[in-house]
């Protein structure tokens, strides 16, 4: 864990981007905990989990973020990876568009891998945000750099929760 400290960056003007798990209503807390338990007890060595939905505004980004936070609450190294490059709820909800280098910058070759990983207030949870909006997200995430990123993050984290775009066109 100490080695991680040398490459994790501070998120500028970081605000708490999701309520603490304990601040959620009981039913929401329980749903997140059941999901977390199902992942842990699946029998598979699930390390990278994609969260998606049929259409926008169904709550996938909130679920993905809170699931990451819940796993970190168990002292598991957890990474929230925002891959909704065209329409990131997390970036827009918290007004971070011009404040961070993110996945887009890395995939376009203008930022190093270590420059896009940000720590949160939870020492077990980090985030990679989308960064700039890109006109060609499918091409970016299907390239070699995305594969390299996932391979490296698998070494650093117990869980990687990937917030993906909705399945149906936006």
Task: Name each region found by the language model.
Residues 1-170:
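P-loop NTP-binding module
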């Amino acid at each position: 864990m100490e080695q991680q400290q040398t490459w994790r960056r501070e998120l500028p003007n970081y605000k708490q981007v999701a309520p603490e798990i304990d601040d959620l209503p009981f039913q929401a807390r329980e749903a997140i905990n059941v999901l977390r338990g199902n992942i842990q007890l699946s029998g598979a060595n699930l390390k990278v989990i994609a969260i998606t939905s049929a259409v926008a505004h169904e709550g996938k980004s909130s679920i993905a973020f809170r699931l990451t936070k819940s796993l970190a609450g168990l002292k598991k190294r957890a990474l929230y990876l925002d891959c909704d490059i065209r329409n990131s709820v997390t970036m827009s909800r918290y007004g971070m568009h011009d404040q961070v280098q993110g996945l887009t910058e890395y995939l376009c070759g203008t930022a190093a891998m270590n420059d896009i990983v940000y720590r949160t207030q939870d020492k077990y949870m980090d985030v990679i945000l989308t960064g700039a909006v890109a006109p060609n997200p499918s091409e970016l995430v299907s390239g070699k750099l995305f594969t390299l990123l996932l391979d490296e993050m698998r070494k650093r984290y117990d869980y990687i929760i990937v917030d993906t775009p909705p399945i149906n066109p936006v």
